[in-house]
Regions:
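Aromatic- and glycine-enriched pocket-lining scaffold segments that form the walls
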Residues: 163-235
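Carbohydrate-binding/catalytic loop surfaces
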Residues: 42, 47-49, 64-67, 99-125, ...
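Conserved small/polar residues in nucleotide/adenosyl-binding loops
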Residues: 273-278
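Sec-dependent signal peptide recognition
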Residues: 2-8
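C-terminal motif of bacterial Sec signal peptides marking the signal peptidase cleavage site
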Residues: 13-14
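Short, contiguous, pocket-lining structural segments
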Residues: 54, 178-185, 204-211, 253-268
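Low-complexity, Ser/Thr/Pro/Gly-enriched N-terminal "stalk/linker" regions
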Residues: 20-101, 137-141, 145-146, 150, ...
C-alpha cells in the first residue's frame, strides 16, 4: 500500500516527451477528429464533413469548438484548415455575403439562429493577421461586421410601450418573443465584435455595450424564478397573441413558458462566460 503514491509519478514519466509516441490517445483530440471534423448532426441532418457543411448554428458551434481545440493544439493544422474551409464555403470573395447551400442569403430577416456560426470569424481574422494575410483577414472582419450590423440595426425588437422594449425577437415569425437560447445566438458575437473592433467609435461602442446589457437584463427580469433559481425557457411581451399560445396567461410569471429547459440553461451559462470573456 505504501507504494501506491508512486502510480501518478509513473504515469507522468510514461507520458514524458521522450516517450510521447507511446502515450494513450488524447481524448479531446479524438473527439475532434471523430465528431468535429465530421460525423455529426445538424439537428436531424447528418453531416459527413465539417469543411463542406453549409451554414447552420449547429455546424457553426461545431466549427467554433474545433477552432478552440486548434488553439490548444496548434500543431493540428487540419483543425484550423477545416474551420477555414467551412467559413469560406459560405462566404463570397470579400466577405460581404454569407450564403447557404442553395446560394441564398444565409442570414434570414430577424432570425437569430442564423448568427452564431459567425463566432469563428474572430479567430480566423486573428490567425490570418498573424500570418500576414491581410486580405483574408479583412474578409473575415467584413463578415463579422455584416452579422453584427444585421443584428444591431436590422433585427426586429420589442417596441415601447410593451415591456422589454429594445429586446431582440427570437425570430420574425415569433414577434415579441424572447427565448433563452436566442440570447446565446446573438449576444456573444455582438460582444466579441465590440471588444475587437468597437473601440474605433467611442460613442457607438458605449451604446452597443448598453444594448448588449439590455438583452441580459430583460430576459433575466422577466424569466427568472428566484424560488427555483432557474430561468424559464421563453418569455413573450404579448402573451395574449395567438402566436404566444404556450405562454402563462396570468400570475407572477405571465408571459413565461410553463417549463424550464435544461439545454437552454446550459446555453445561458455558456453565453454569460463567452460575453464576459469578450
Amino acid at each position: 500500500m505504501k507504494h501506491h503514491y508512486l502510480w501518478p509519478i509513473l504515469l507522468l514519466i510514461s507520458c514524458s516527451p521522450a516517450k510521447k509516441e507511446k502515450c494513450e490517445p488524447i481524448y479531446s483530440q479524438m473527439m475532434v477528429e471523430t465528431h468535429g471534423l465530421g460525423d455529426f448532426y445538424c439537428n436531424r441532418h447528418h453531416q459527413a464533413k465539417l469543411d463542406t457543411t453549409g451554414w447552420d448554428y449547429v455546424s457553426g458551434l461545431v466549427a467554433h469548438s474545433v477552432l478552440k481545440a486548434w488553439s490548444a493544439y496548434p500543431e493540428k493544422k487540419a483543425y484550423y484548415d477545416a474551420v477555414k474551409a467551412f467559413a469560406d464555403n459560405s462566404l463570397n470573395e470579400d466577405g460581404t455575403f454569407i450564403h447557404n447551400k442553395k446560394g441564398k442569403d444565409a442570414l434570414r430577416p430577424s432570425n437569430i439562429d442564423d448568427l452564431p456560426a459567425g463566432n469563428i470569424f474572430f479567430g480566423l481574422y486573428e490567425e490570418e493577421m498573424r500570418q500576414g494575410d491581410t486580405l483574408e483577414a479583412s474578409k473575415y472582419k467584413t463578415a463579422a461586421t455584416l452579422i453584427r450590423n444585421r443584428l444591431k440595426y436590422d433585427h426586429s425588437r420589442i417596441k415601447a410601450p410593451l415591456p422589454g422594449a429594445g429586446c431582440f425577437f427570437h425570430k420574425a415569425v415569433y414577434p415579441n418573443q424572447v427565448w433563452l437560447d436566442g440570447l446565446f445566438m446573438g449576444s456573444p458575437i455582438y460582444a466579441q465584435w465590440q471588444a475587437k473592433f468597437g473601440k474605433e467609435d467611442t460613442k457607438d461602442n458605449n451604446e452597443s455595450w448598453s444594448d448588449i446589457a439590455l438583452q441580459f437584463k430583460t430576459i433575466h427580469q422577466y424569466s427568472y424564478n428566484a424560488e427555483k433559481q432557474l430561468n424559464y425557457h421563453a418569455w413573450t411581451a404579448t402573451p395574449e397573441d395567438e402566436n404566444s399560445f404556450w405562454a402563462q396567461q396570468d400570475g407572477k410569471f405571465k408571459g413565461c413558458s410553463p417549463e424550464f429547459w435544461a439545454r437552454s440553461m446550459g446555453w445561458y451559462i455558456c453565453l454569460l462566460y463567452t460575453s464576459d470573456a469578450a
